[in-house]
Amino acid sequence: QINHASTMQDVANAASLIHAPGLNIMYGDSLGNIAWWAAAKLPIRGTAVHPTIFADGSDPAAQPQGWYPFTENPQSINPESGFVASANNQPDSTRSGIFFPGYYYPGERWNRIAKTVTSKKDWTQESLEDLQLETINEKSVQNADFLLEQVSQGNFEKYEDILSELAEWEGDHDLGHTAPTLYYKWLYHTLRLAMEDEIGKEGFESYLQTFIMIGSTSHFFTHEQNKWWDKKNTSTKETRAEIVAEALKVSLEELTQQFGEGQGEWEWEKAVTVEHPHPLGAKKPLDKLFNVRTEAVEANEESVNKLAFKLNGTGIYKVTSGPAMRILLDFENVEESVSVLPTGNSGNRFSKHYADQKELYVEG
């Protein structure tokens, strides 16, 4: 129905038919209308049911008591702000005032989009390209500043250059910069030293893969008396500052061993790898034939141009997800619309269009 829609209401009606999985439907037309709908069939739960705890399916009280009408779903139609955006964040555009639970990301991307879009009115296709390619994460800057506050930099005089770089970091992930290289290594070891003794190595590595880690790290850092800071296997009680300092020491030693004594050589580019997998490339040696490798990209977590990776202790970060397509469409000049795919239009390894867009995707 969406493909055959001729009005905004037609699209809304079609979106109301989507039950699961939940989708964000974004809309715009040549008349200047814009809209966003959270499309899903949302259950009405009893007060005794908690969305994050397993429920007894045999208990009638745990069953849905009904379904909210689509008109109560989170949505935004021609808002006064003049824009709509979605970045897998907790929506607040609900008519009923209900905040529906879900696996939402923290909101850094949406906040950055909203902040940037509302900062100017003279948007052009070129400036929108810049926004789509932006790799700034303001929350990471806050985390880095907090970590730096916990240590006496006089104890790390040998590493004054890299610490100064991190102190001046604005959250970008430019490939030639060194601040991200230190930040993510330091972040990993701080969390590891705080948590691994309580939940074990396997549990900690599993924790790093969760939404909880992404959403709670800043809050975790702010609790000085948090019991996580104390190591269970020692007779003394470690403090937050001691754990953060130890994590920095380990991080600097590992980066020196990994990239050399010259701190200016610790560029983010050297810590990032990119490979677009093909179903037939899952097993070696077919990966060398079917998978598409590219130059390094500005890997990051939760920026507008999200090129995500899993935090780990190796100091090498493999990009695991990114924009499936970038597209800019001007309804006043549709013929000049532009788009790019991560690799190419064809899934046929022997087609000339199999990977002919990979460089353009990397460069933007």
What kind of region is each of these model predictions?
Residues 1-164, 168-364:
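C-terminal/peripheral segments of proteins
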